[in-house]
A protein has these predicted regions:
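Class II aminoacyl-tRNA synthetase catalytic cores and aaRS-like
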Residues: 1-169
Length: 169
């Protein structure tokens, strides 16, 4: 029983109980557990219950595409409350178009009008229906910020911040 407590008091008490329970099973649990608020989770992972083991972070590219010839991105980049975000699926650059289209179908269930993507093939080639609209500077900035390597698949969402986070999460 606890009186006059806040969220941190409850979380700290539960951490102690969990650490003790795991300790009795021979598993050491480091404390304190990492804590993040809702907005940090959504902004970084696109989910309010992120699986942090994989390091697949959403990356904000809004500033890169503010003057893009790709109107979908330029519009979102210049609209209050909207963003251009992306996620790098490392090693997925060889996925077939059908598999990417299937992901676009899943994204549409979250309200996406589409799922923009760029596949960076192992042989150095690039496959994408949108890359023709990007300047060399935009591509260079994208590659750097997304830490793109041959074999990667970068997927984008553009529009209202929370919707874009949910689509990519």
């Amino acid at each position: 029983e606890m009186s006059f407590v806040d969220q941190n008091d409850v979380m700290s008490a539960l951490e102690e109980v969990l650490a003790d329970a795991f300790g009795r099973m021979g598993v050491e649990m480091p404390t304190p557990l990492r804590r993040m608020d809702y907005w940090e989770a959504m902004d970084t992972y696109g989910s309010d219950k992120p699986d942090t083991r994989y390091g697949m972070h959403l990356v904000d590219l809004t500033d890169i595409f503010a003057n893009s010839k790709f109107k979908v991105f330029a519009t979102a980049a210049n609209e209050e409350g909207s963003v251009v975000k992306a996620i790098n699926a490392k090693g997925a650059g060889a996925w077939a178009r059908a598999k990417i289209d299937k992901l676009a179908g899943v994204a549409s269930t979250f309200g996406a009008k589409g799922l923009a993507w760029i596949a960076f093939r192992e042989d150095g080639s690039i496959n994408s229906p949108i890359v023709k609209f990007f300047s060399d500077e935009e591509m260079a900035a994208l590659r750097e910020r997304m830490d793109v390597e041959p074999g990667d698949l970068v997927m984008f969402a553009a529009g209202p911040r929370l919707l874009s986070d949910e689509i990519l999460g």
